[in-house]
A protein has these predicted regions:
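Hinge/cleft segment of the Venus flytrap/periplasmic-binding protein
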Residues: 35-81, 232-233, 328-408
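Extracytoplasmic "Venus flytrap"
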Residues: 37-43, 54, 58-105, 109, ...
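Hydrophobic alpha-helical segments within soluble ligand-binding/sensing domains
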Residues: 49, 61-70, 131, 185-210, ...
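An alpha-beta-alpha
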Residues: 83-84, 91, 102-103, 194-244, ...
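Short beta-strand elements in bilobed, periplasmic/extracellular small-molecule ligand-binding domains
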Residues: 109-124, 209-212, 233-251
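Short beta-strand elements at the ligand-binding edges of bilobed clamshell
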Residues: 123, 177-199, 212-216, 244, ...
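Hydrophobic alpha-helical
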Residues: 136-138, 144-164, 229, 247-309, ...
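Flexible loop/hinge segments that line or gate small-molecule binding clefts
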Residues: 153-191, 209, 303-315
Length: 408
């Protein structure tokens, strides 16, 4: 995961090209950052990250800040907590699953006497100024925990600081904010690109042409993922990125862009690195052009992709990251915080499960079709074990216990 990120079945209505300038759909926040940190600065920053998690922090500066000991002077409110969700867009199934999971987790805490029973939800529909107003209102109205899918890395910072000063916990779900008063729980887009470059090079034996199928131009996810892939591929002289396209996380748009590219580029294409919801459209474009379907990699585990994968016997992989499991993953660190535990860093990056040919049948169901709108989450819905987050916290009391629920 890091956008409307909304990895989901989505985008027919959400991410049109006209909306590209204001909605950040699967990838989230617009890219805006300073120069790359020096090796010394990187080493200093990573020294605060648990050793076993540092491998997931490559290129961390593309996704946001990593601040050491950011909540040293912060104290949580006592239960029962009012849990709230501040969202930038609620127009697709990925976000719907996210909210459904948060509602289920809130009920579990309420049943234990630790929370009020209803999750308070706001939706700014892509308007960052409205989202900020909604955030400030949530703080004023007594929210104790605010989970959020922010529409900007910086646009909510005044509200997040206000929350921090009033003892309200703000947790950004897979769309990091730069303000140190918020806790980010996310996947690292640079790492996804790096992994993709290494995997593709291995499948092609170090020789072949690659197309990058991006989502929206200019978002942090877009820049980080493509940079991670390009820097990895550049280390192998037989590999070449021959195209960088933008499909707006929408299969039909991706198909159209690939068709246009193939019409003017007759050279063989060995692989397409797709960044969300576009794998089927990419493959169909090659078929329509009379070209062999290349290796296709993905970052969203749509059932439609697995059906197409099965039908065409693809060489492929996809990350697993539905909205419900992502919400649960972000909620666990929030519970650590509400138990008085202190996070070592402001941004917690986590790995994701990966579907390959080796474990394909653990996720595929015969009922899946190319028209399916579900996510292939498998039997174990956890993206990482709950214990993964233990290494990021010190002190405090044991956290409250909750269980992940299926929302897909």
């Amino acid at each position: 995961m890091i956008a409307c990120k909304d990895r989901a079945t989505l985008a027919r209505r959400v991410c049109t090209l006209a909306a590209a300038v204001t909605l950040f759909c699967l990838g989230g926040v617009a890219a805006s950052r300073a120069a790359d940190p020096s090796p010394e600065e990187q080493k200093k920053t990573l020294s605060a990250v648990p050793a076993d998690a540092q491998k997931y922090y490559g290129g961390y500066w593309y996704a946001g800040n990593v601040v050491a000991d950011p909540f040293a002077d912060w104290k949580p409110h006592p239960p029962p907590w009012q849990i709230c969700h501040n969202d930038s867009y609620l127009g697709n199934s990925w976000r719907a699953n996210l909210v459904a999971e948060l509602k289920a987790l809130t009920k579990q805490l309420a049943d234990q006497g630790l929370a009020k029973p209803d999750l308070i939800v706001t939706n700014s529909n892509g308007d960052i100024n409205l989202e900020l107003s909604q955030l400030k209102a949530q703080v004023a109205q007594g929210c104790d925990i605010i989970m959020s899918y922010p529409g900007s890395a910086t646009g909510l910072c005044s509200g997040i600081k206000d929350a921090y000063n009033k003892g309200v916990l703000f947790v950004a779900i897979d769309s990091p904010v730069t303000c140190p008063e918020g806790l980010n729980v996310a996947t690292n887009p640079y790492y996804r690109g790096q992994f993709g470059g290494e995997w593709i090079a291995k499948q092609l034996n170090g020789k072949g042409n690659v197309i990058v199928m991006n989502g929206q131009p200019g978002t942090a996810n877009t820049v980080a993922q493509e940079t991670g892939l390009r820097q990895t591929v550049a280390s192998d002289p037989g590999m070449k990125v021959v195209g960088s396209l933008f499909g707006m996380w929408t299969g039909s748009v991706a198909k159209s862009e690939v068709l246009k590219f193939l019409a003017t580029h007759p050279e063989p294409v060995g692989a397409v690195f797709s960044t969300g919801n576009m794998g089927v459209g990419v493959g169909q474009a090659f078929e329509q052009s009379g070209r062999p379907v290349p290796i296709i990699t993905e970052v969203t585990n749509l059932c439609s992709l697995l059906a197409y994968w099965k039908e065409k016997n693809l060489t492929a992989y996809t990350f697993v990251q539905d909205g419900g499991p992502m919400a649960y993953a972000a909620f666990i660190p929030a519970l650590h915080m509400m138990a008085g535990q202190k996070p070592k860093v402001s941004t917690i990056f986590m790995p994701l499960p990966i579907i390959t040919s080796d474990n394909f049948n653990d996720y595929y169901e015969p009922s899946m079709t190319v028209q399916s709108t579900c996510f292939a989450n498998g039997k174990d819905l956890h993206l990482v074990p709950d214990e993964y987050f233990d290494q990021f916290f010190t002190g405090g009391q044991p956290r409250a216990q909750v269980k992940i629920v299926p929302t897909n």
